[in-house]
């Protein structure tokens, strides 16, 4: 079920403070975050986030197409190795 419209989007306070200070300074330095649950807002466009996927930090450059999604959607936590292929018989 989606989040209620009257509540508004969720963004961790510490992350929003970092975003606003980066915008004020004009800094291009990536913001390191573990907050995968935070929603991407229009204020975040043009900022690079290093989003933790449980093992490493994945760089995510936010564009206008990312607005409304969560940061964790752009940093996959699982790697798909593929299914075992059919074995060719010799002979």
Swiss-Prot record:
InterPro entries recorded: Ribosomal_uS19 (IPR002222), Ribosomal_uS19_bac-type (IPR005732), Ribosomal_uS19_CS (IPR020934), Ribosomal_uS19_SF (IPR023575)
Any one biological process term the GO annotation gives: ribosomal small subunit assembly
Keyword terms: Ribonucleoprotein, Ribosomal protein, RNA-binding, rRNA-binding
Recorded GO MF terms: rRNA binding; structural constituent of ribosome
PROSITE patterns tied to this protein: RIBOSOMAL_S19
Keyword Ribosomal protein: yes
Statement: the UniProt record of this protein carries the keyword Nucleus: no
Annotated Pfam families: Ribosomal_S19
Gene3D superfamilies in UniProt: 30s Ribosomal Protein S19, Chain A
GO cellular component terms, semicolon-separated: cytoplasm; small ribosomal subunit
Record's function text: Protein S19 forms a complex with S13 that binds strongly to the 16S ribosomal RNA.
NCBIfam families linked to this entry: rpsS_bact (TIGR01050)
Family named by the database record: Belongs to the universal ribosomal protein uS19 family.
Protein name as annotated: Small ribosomal subunit protein uS19
Species of the source: Sulfurimonas denitrificans (strain ATCC 33889 / DSM 1251) (Thiomicrospira denitrificans (strain ATCC 33889 / DSM 1251))
Gene behind this protein: rpsS
